[in-house]
Amino acid sequence: MNPNCARCGKIVYPTEKVNCLDKYWHKACFHCETCKMTLNMKNYKGYEKKPYCNAHYPKQSFTMVADTPENLRLKQQSELQSQVRYKEEFEKNKGKGFSVVADTPELQRIKKTQDQISNIKYHEEFEKSRMGPSGGEGVEPERREAQDSSSYRRPTEQQQPQPHHIPTSAPVYQQPQQQQMTSSYGGYKEPAAPVSIQRSAPGGGGKRYRAVYDYSAADEDEVSFQDGDTIVNVQQIDDGWMYGTVERTGDTGMLPANYVEAI
């Protein structure tokens, strides 16, 4: 249904309709309220939802007010209220910005834990990239050399996981066979226990290290230690990992090389 014109009240058809100031107008009825000049969408100015030309557009006029004591008091009171509101907003938003955090022992522990997690993730990514399909053939000889030197195999390099103290369990199992061999020859009754003990000890040359950071084991083949612990029977596996025994707890396993220093 066609709307009515806001000026003359007659029906406005689409061919002559002007939609402006939230009303509908005929093109001929859309003129200035004062001089009746026909306006368009480019040169009109609206005031109280009525069209005006640029010359007759109502202008705001300001009245001069004398600086009486009452007016000065009101002005000063308004400024004080504005200043009070500004301080209130400032105090409300004060805690939402940057604030200095005290370096407490709890925050230091959290920071150290995050550094350890980042270091572990770095080593995991390094191991994954080193054991990828493209570089698997070149890494295999290095892996075998590490197994022969340390008598230890990481779970990621074998199909079935083995117990934590692998070097001590294997020679004990071979001891009865050695005794049977010596008894079959006859006359030689010296026990083969020293041989098994000699193999069970890690071949690290008696190196001793001291822990400079706390470390929590991230895998079953690793050991946990605290700052200041002594690591004995240490042997180097690669640039990033070592194998040794924590003297305080007696646990044996892998540990990161950058968490300890030589004594």
From Swiss-Prot:
Q: Which residues carry this modification: N6-methyllysine?
A: K75
Q: Where are the Nebulin repeats?
A: 61-95, 97-131
Ranges of compositional bias, category Polar residues: 148-162
User: InterPro entries of this UniProt entry?
Assistant: Lasp1_SH3, LIM-SH3_domain_protein, Nebulin_repeat, SH3-like_dom_sf, SH3_domain, Znf_LIM
Spell out which residues are annotated as carrying Phosphoserine. S99, S118, S134
Could you tell me the keywords of this UniProt record? Acetylation, Actin-binding, Cytoplasm, Cytoskeleton, Ion transport, LIM domain, Metal-binding, Methylation, Phosphoprotein, Repeat, SH3 domain, Transport, Zinc
Cited CDD domains: LIM_LASP, SH3_Lasp1_C
Q: Which Gene Ontology CC terms are recorded?
A: cortical actin cytoskeleton; cytoplasm; focal adhesion
**Phosphothreonine sites (modified residues):** T68, T104, T156
Q: Biological process (GO) annotations?
A: monoatomic ion transport
PTM annotation (N6-acetyllysine): residues: K42
Q: Where in the cell is it found?
A: Cytoplasm, Cell cortex; Cytoplasm, Cytoskeleton
Q: Where is this region: Disordered?
A: 123-207
Describe the location of the LIM zinc-binding domain by residue ranges: 5-56
- A GO MF label: metal ion binding
Positions of modified residues (N6-succinyllysine)? K112
Q: Which residues carry this modification: N-acetylmethionine?
A: M1
What Pfam families does the entry give? Answer: LIM (PF00412), Nebulin (PF00880), SH3_9 (PF14604)
Query: What is the superkingdom listed in this entry's lineage?
Result: Eukaryota
Q: What is its main location?
A: cytoplasm
Explain the purpose of this protein: Plays an important role in the regulation of dynamic actin-based, cytoskeletal activities. Agonist-dependent changes in LASP1 phosphorylation may also serve to regulate actin-associated ion transport activities, not only in the parietal cell but also in certain other F-actin-rich secretory epithelial cell types.
What name is this protein filed under? LIM and SH3 domain protein 1
Q: Which organism is it from?
A: Mus musculus
